Amino acid sequence: MPAENRFLHQQYPSDPLNDPVLRTLNVNEAAETDFSKLHTVLKIGRIQLVHGTFMGDDPFGIADTLKAVAESVPLLAGQLNRMAEALLEKTRPFTTSMTGDIGNYHEPYRKRFQELVGDDPQVELLSPTWSGQNHHLARADLAIRLFHQLLIRPLLPDQNLLLWGHSHAGNAFALLTNLLTNHKPSVAEFFDKAAQEGQTHWDDVRTHLEKSPSPHPLASRILIAAFATPVRYGWDTDGYARLVHITHHRPVDDAAPARTKPLFPPHLPGDVINARWGDWVQAFAVAGTDVSSMPTRAINQNLASLLEANLPDLEHGLDTRLIMPKRVRDTCVRWKSGTRCHSDGLNLLVDYEPSGDLSPIGRPLEQSLLGHGVATTVRWLPTHLKLVMDALML
């Protein structure tokens, strides 16, 4: 996407600016790597780990719904709000206890990351976390939270920040690049559509951007590693310093090796479970797959009028024209495109040699979560870190 992307959406199929790189990874290839270059060469002083969808403190919007009902029924407000707060407190720890490092960043992952890089940079899990809900507002809120963190905990003058995120966290990073470019009219429209007045982090970031130059000075200090991020929001090239995508991929067609096997017609179940063509979830989560919670439905419709405004009307063949409703019909056409790569940044399409390790449910790590879970595993972290460091230094 261009400079001054103005919150435009990527297209299906996408048109990568740089040629994707395909390669195979071995779990032991980073054994002798000197990771000090992250600090000495790339000047990274902080690494922020951000989990993806459904791994947050309110992934299905239950707490949000309870709070919305509480506003409408004052007599029950106290009880409902207490229930909501209890859910927010307990959901993330429960999820982490069940998933471990499969599709999720947790404390053992952070500790291993810190061991690899030494005392500098500092490696942090995002705290407080984000909801993990699967819609525009949740990802927009994450982008604002990340920006707000930089306001309340500024980087040192000579430091850069590496954002290291999984799945739709990467799409929050994309929104952040549009915010950092700070095209005043489109940023104002973004805040108006989100309608989050009264939320401290939203108010603080909006006020700050209104007073800041364009692009924001922080833009040149943001490096991004996006793992398994679905192709959604456009990246603004004035809103970051460097960007690399790491996606589990196995080519299906030698004539178009960077495309994935189209998800429509559907894959055979065994091919999905065994990640025969790589990360199925990353290819699945295109525009049209969001799920709004009850309290966010209207706001998400408003945000879609900005964030999906440039998605074209789609032409349908015999295989899709009778599918109802229109949203599903259009999503099927997008799945047919086999879109794997992002328009901007360096797309690293990686296949994994089997490590021999198994997930808690007995699946090979490389097949976990339909090929989506390997990106966050401690076992593959050294190799992933070497891959990212080398790419950022190109």
Language-model regions: role of each:
Residues 2-81:
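N-terminal low-complexity, Ser/Thr- and acidic-residue-enriched intrinsically disordered segments
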Residues 12-18, 94-96, 191-194, 209-216, ...:
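A generic short-segment signal for beta-strand/edge and adjacent turn/coil regions
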Residues 34, 109-118, 150-154, 180, ...:
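Hydrophobic, Leu/Ile/Phe/Ala-enriched alpha-helical segments that form helix-helix packing faces
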Residues 47, 164-167, 368:
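A composition/secondary-structure signal for short, hydrophobic, low-basic-content segments
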Residues 48-159:
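Active-site catalytic motif of lipid deacylating hydrolases and related acyltransferases
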Residues 76-80, 93-103, 237-394:
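C-terminal catalytic-base region of ester-bond hydrolases, centering on the histidine
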Residues 102-113, 122-129, 215-236, 342-345:
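Extended, compositionally biased low-complexity polar/Lys-Gly-rich tracts
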Residues 136-273:
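Serine-dependent carboxylesterase/thioesterase catalytic core
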